[in-house]
Amino acid sequence: APLSGAHADECAKYLVPITGNIPPELRFASIDSYFKAAQGRGLPLSCAELIGMGTLRTLAAGFTTGDLSPLELRDLHYHMEAALADGACGVSLGLGYAPEIFYSTDGLIRALAPLHRSGVPICVHMRQEGDGVVDALREMLEVARALQTPLEVSHVKAIGSRNARKAVPQ
């Protein structure tokens, strides 16, 4: 969730290899409607939901490349703010995967602008874990500092023996 709007079918199709076909009754328009549906089934629900930037970007712009237009950013921000208001506790990024791979660093900062000084964490799978690992970490530190928001880097690792002793940026 959310999975609604002009690009919802495109987003659902992209998710098929991960989730399988998502039947219409499980395409929730918001995080709130997802939580209500789960609670309505009597499930003992205890979870913290991250809103996926890939989902937000796809809903706003489909699989276009490059930075988002002002109209697409407005749509993305609307969905992000609604998901956070509904109870999402952070924003998840997978910068090694489409469509998030298409962001420039500045474009990423613009897309994440609603998080500025919010205390809402960015949880990221960085662009690189091999030879570009230090640059990828620098990029995310730049984003978090620009937004003045917490950063969580998932699966911190440096692939390849030549990367094992690289200095971590401060």
For the regions a protein language model found, what residue spans apply to each?
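Divalent-metal coordination cores built from histidine and acidic residues
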Residues: 1-89
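Histidine/acidic residue-rich metal-binding segments in metalloenzymes
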Residues: 32-35, 39-42, 67-94, 99-170
